[in-house]
Amino acid sequence: MSSYFFTHFALHTIGTLGGVIPDFPWLSVSILFPIGCAFLIPFFPDKGEGKEVRWFALSVALITFLVTVGSYINGFDINNEDVQLKESINWLPNLGLTWSVGADGMSMPLILLTSFITALAVLAAWPVKFKPKLFFFLILIMDGGQIAVFAVQDMLLFFLSWELELLPVYLLLAIWGGKNRQYAATKFIIYTAGSSIFILLAALAMGFYGTEVPNFEFSHLANQDFGQNFQILCYIGLLIAFGVKLPIVPLHTWLPDAHGEATAPVHMLLAGILLKMGGYALLRFNAQLLPIAHAQFSPLLIVLGVVNIIYAALTSFAQRNLKRKIAYSSISHMGFVLIGIGSFSSLGTSGAMLQMVSHGLIGASLFFLVGATYDRTKTLKLDEMGGVGQKMRIMFALWTACSLASLALPGMSGFVSELMVFTGFVTDEVYTLPFRVIMASLAAIGVILTPIYLLSMLREIFFGKENPKLTEDKNLIDAEPREIYIIACLLLPIIGIGLYPRLVTESYLATINNLVDRDLNAVKNIPKTNVFAGNKSNQILKAPTI
C-alpha cells in the first residue's frame, strides 16, 4: 500500500509541476537528479547490509522514472517531429560546448526505457551485500549518464555522456563479476574506450567544419553541407564506435565475456540499455547527420545485420553456458535493428526503433532470470542443470513466457518489431528485388533457429537429465515475490506493445518519417546497380498507424 500511495503522490506532484511550471527542466532533472543523489550515498553509515542504501537507491530510481514519465505526459507532442523539451545553456562558450538537452521521437522512448529498466535493476540488486554503497552509487551514475546519451543535443556533450558510463560498467564487472571478471572488464574497457576516440574525432571534425567558431549542436550539424568524402570518413569512424556498442559482428566479442561474468542487475543494464545506445547513435548520427554516406553504406548495414542474425543464432545454438547463450541471442536480435536502419522505408526504420524497445524489455527479463536461476543452481552449465522443473514451477512459467517473447511469438512485442523490419525491407523499392529476396531469405534462417535453441534450452534446464545435487537439494526454492514482480513489470509492456504497438510507435512516427525523407533525397543521386534500383527510390513506404 505504501508504494501505491508513494506512486500516486509522485504522479500528482509531477502533474502539478507540469501545470504550474510550464518550462520545468524535465530532462535536466532526469539526468542530474540520480547523479546528484549518487554522491549522497557515501554519507550513509557503513553498518549492516546496506538496507538504507537500497531503499534510497530504489526511491531515487523510481522518482527518476516518474520524472521521465512526467516529461512525456506534460511536454511531449507525438505529432511534432522536431526536438521538444529543449533546454540550452552556454556552458563553455569558448569551446563551443553548450548544455543542450531535448527529446524527439527517437530519443523519448529510449529515455523512458532507461529509467524503467534502471528502477527494476535496482530492485533486482536487492540481494547485493558486498560493498552495497559503491554498487548503488555506480548504478545511479549510470542511470543519469544513460539518460543523457539519449537526451543531449550537442555532439561533444554526447561524447562526454557516452564516456560517463564506461567506468561504472567496468567497476560493476571487475568488482562484482564472476571468476574471470578482470578479463571481461578489461576487454570491455579496451573495446568501448578504444572505439570512442572515433566519436571524439568525428565530433571535432563536424563541429569545426567550415568555421573557426565550433558549434556541436545537432540542429546546426543537421543543416551543414558536409562534402561526400568528409561524410564517408566520419561515417566509417562512427560506424566502428557504435558498432562496438550495438554490437556488430565481428566487433562483438566483448559482450559474451561481459555477460558471462556480470551479475543480474548489470545484465539488465547491459542488455536493456547499453546495446540500445549503439542503435540510437547510428540513427541519430549516421542516418540523420550524414545522409549521403548513409545512402552508400546502407547495403553494408543490411549485410551486417543478416550476418549478426545468422552467426549469433548459430553460435547461441552451440553454447553450453546459459549466460553466453542468451548473450549471443541478444546479438542476433540486434541484427534486426541494423536491417531496419539500413532500409529506406519508414516501416523498416520504425521497426528498428520498436525492436530496440522490445529487446530492451525482453533482454532484461531473460538475463534477470539467468541470474535468479544461477543463484539457486550455482551453475551456468546446461549439462549440470536438469530436472528442476518440479521444484521450480513458477520459475519455469516465467522462463517460458520470456522465451516465447524472445522467439517473437505473435501477441508479444518482438513479433511486431521483427515483422515491421522484414516487411519494410522486403517491400522497399530502393533496393533491387534479388538483393531483397536474398537478404530476407538468409535472415529467415536466424528466425527459424531462434525457437530451436530457446525451447531446447528450456527443456535442458527444467526437464533434462536430472542432476541429483539439484533435485535433492532442500534449499532449491521457487521464484520469490520480488522476482515475480520484476518479470511481471517487464512482461506487461511486452504483451501490451505486442497487442497494441501504437503505445510506442505513435511517439516516433513523425520523427522517423522525416528522417527517412531526408535519407531518400540522398539515395536519389545513386545510380542503378545490382543493389540499388535507381529511379524507383522516389517512393517511401510510410510506417503503419496500427
Curated annotation (Swiss-Prot):
Disulfide bonds: none annotated. The chain crosses the membrane at residues 24-44, 56-76, 108-128, 132-152, 156-176, 188-208, 232-252, 263-283, 297-317, 326-346, 352-372, 396-416, 437-457, 484-504. Pfam families: Proton_antipo_M. It is found in: Cellular thylakoid membrane. InterPro entries: NADH_Q_OxRdtase_chain4 (IPR022997), NADH_Q_OxRdtase_chainM/4 (IPR010227), NADH_UbQ_OxRdtase (IPR003918), ND/Mrp_TM (IPR001750). One of its GO terms (biological process) is electron transport coupled proton transport. The keyword Phosphoprotein does not apply. It catalyses: a plastoquinone + NADH + (n+1) H(+)(in) = a plastoquinol + NAD(+) + n H(+)(out); a plastoquinone + NADPH + (n+1) H(+)(in) = a plastoquinol + NADP(+) + n H(+)(out). Its EC number is 7.1.1.-. GO terms for molecular function: NADH dehydrogenase (ubiquinone) activity; ubiquinone binding. It comes from the Bacteria. It is a multi-pass membrane protein. One of its GO terms (cellular component) is plasma membrane-derived thylakoid membrane. NDH-1 shuttles electrons from NAD(P)H, via FMN and iron-sulfur (Fe-S) centers, to quinones in the respiratory chain. The immediate electron acceptor for the enzyme in this species is believed to be plastoquinone. Couples the redox reaction to proton translocation (for every two electrons transferred, four hydrogen ions are translocated across the cytoplasmic membrane), and thus conserves the redox energy in a proton gradient. Belongs to the complex I subunit 4 family. HAMAP family: NDH1_NuoM. This is NAD(P)H-quinone oxidoreductase chain 4. It comes from Prochlorococcus marinus subsp. pastoris (strain CCMP1986 / NIES-2087 / MED4).
